Design a protein with these regions (language model features):
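Electropositive, beta-rich accessory/interaction domains or terminal extensions
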Residues: 1-101, 128, 138-156
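A conserved acidic, glycine/proline-rich C-terminal tail/linker
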Residues: 102-123
């Protein structure tokens, strides 16, 4: 189990993320007001753990994550896991691959973050998330009946 340490929303493309104490989360869209949230997208909310940020000497929000977590082992998470964050539920849809913009923060950071940039999620249940809220895995990948490609993952 972990906790929400920081919440960020991007209001204008290519501008710094804005930190929030709490944020409304919209089902199948993402954070209210965040330009990166889109209906149907598998990239509605991004998460990174504080431990990774600390390892690379990065401040929360600088790599454009929506949620900075603390105390949850990202290595134990998998595509299809359902996370309860505050009173919302999100499905992990895949790893967040570091883009070339990471090298704008610090040359070589894109390669350094490969495999460690966190997770992408889609919002399954709307609600509100606040700093300090608990994060818990509420369903493993194989238990998540709403995942459309579940059969392919189980059989393949």
């Amino acid at each position: 189990m972990g906790e929400v340490q920081h919440l960020f929303s991007c209001l204008v493309h290519r501008f710094p993320m804005q930190e929030q104490d709490e944020i409304e989360v919209i089902k199948d869209k993402g954070f209210k007001g965040c330009i990166h949230g889109r209906p149907g997208s598998k990239r509605q909310v991004s998460l990174i753990d504080r431990e990774t940020l600390d390892k690379f000497g990065l401040a929360p929000g600088v790599v454009k994550e929506n949620i900075t977590t603390l105390g949850i082992d990202f290595q134990t998470l998998a595509i299809g896991n359902l996370l309860r964050i505050g009173n919302c539920v999100m499905e992990i849809t895949g790893p967040c691959d570091p883009c070339a913009r990471m090298d704008e923060i610090r040359m070589g950071l894109q390669e350094q973050l490969r495999g460690q940039r966190g997770w992408l999620c889609r919002v399954m249940e709307a609600g509100t998330i606040r700093r300090g809220d608990r994060i818990e895995v509420v369903a493993a990948a194989f238990e998540n009946a709403e995942t459309k490609d579940m059969e392919a993952r189980v059989s393949g």
